[in-house]
Amino acid sequence: VYDPVTVDKPETDYGGKREKDNNDENPWQLVEDALKLVEDQVTEDDIQSFCSDGKTIDCVYIVYAGLGQNDGGNGTTVWANCSTTGGKTLRGKEVRWYTMSGELSPEIKDEHGTTIKPEGVNGLGVICHEFSHSLGLPDMYPTAKSAYLNNQEMEYWDLMDGGEYTH
């Protein structure tokens, strides 16, 4: 775990400029910018412990400020995600995977407008979900409306479905 860094670009450069669009435009640039900023904090001993083969870092995890688009942020924010880095490096070592998620979870209100849970620090659910992708686990939530037939999905019982949002 390293000290927070502040990137020079606005969030829209990474999440997107189209507020009603759920597609991130450039999360890889956030990874590259964050790696450059944290590089001075990373020691040679750290690099050795990160590199199981001596050449590559398997995965880095980035927690970005604010809400993620997946958790109440608007369309210009970054959606929590996991992907390959496309050859990004940290202190001369290639980083294979990145995972990222937002720092905050949203306020939740009931049907009467009463706050059930105030906005606060995000729980481990989304972190565990996204990191599990870097280990090879797939999403278990339905990706087609027809898959919601008779409420048969795993929902909150599975970390790779809605369980990531149980706080």
Ranges and model annotations:
Residues 1-153, 157, 161-166:
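Active-site-proximal segment of zinc-dependent metalloprotease catalytic domains
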